[in-house]
Amino acid sequence: MKSEDPHPALATGQAPAEALGFMGFWADIDADYELRYQEWHNCEHMPERVGIPGFIEGRRYRALLGSPRFFMCYVTDGPEVLGSPAYLAALNRPTPWTSESLTHFRNPVRSLYRNHCRVGRAGGYAPYILQRRFDHKADAATLAGMVRAVVAEDTSGTLSGGLYEVDEAISGIMTAERRIYSGGPGRQQYLFTIEALDRDQAEAAGRRLDALMAEGASEINPGLYWLENRIQSAELRRPVAAPVAAAADTRFPERLTP
């Protein structure tokens, strides 16, 4: 039986422009902490975050081209979820494991976005995501037309694209977690994403997108990442709200022994 994405906007790619919120977090991780970081992110952090009301899914990617080395993201029911009391409670009460892990983040960039456009049917399990963080002289409607044009050229039905714009107000909120990793939002106003089942397909779409956006673009930060993990709220047995996230203190695991 063909599996379906439990959230209609992700399944069909036809979400209204403002229907989804998106958090993007780019960071390098200390080399001697990477395994520990992946364990934390898989086993505690993503399940905790995706259990917060309004969160749809979380993902983590590793860089193939560009930097930083890791890209973490969350999709929410709307941008307002990223400034909700439940989410802010989690950000201001990190677990011991989170507090430890965040000290190993380097070159962190965390931006909160509102969605202008999401088209195509590749879905969140597509193994490759190509990104362009950038500024542009054109307005959001014109930029959305560019990503729609690139996806429309694909005849395989296995390509998705999105345009996101930074929400400066909620991106700038200071929290306990942010004080630990000492980072903030990126400089660029916009984010293009192309999700694909094939690396060559993603890179070809990126070249078409680059040609369309070339005139008027500045501060371009490119990247190509492959998917390491994805968790959806529908997959959690007992999702928890942020106010009880501190219960993770009692299950703080021992360190891994290589």
Model features per residue range: what roles?
Residues 2-258:
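Macromolecular interaction modules
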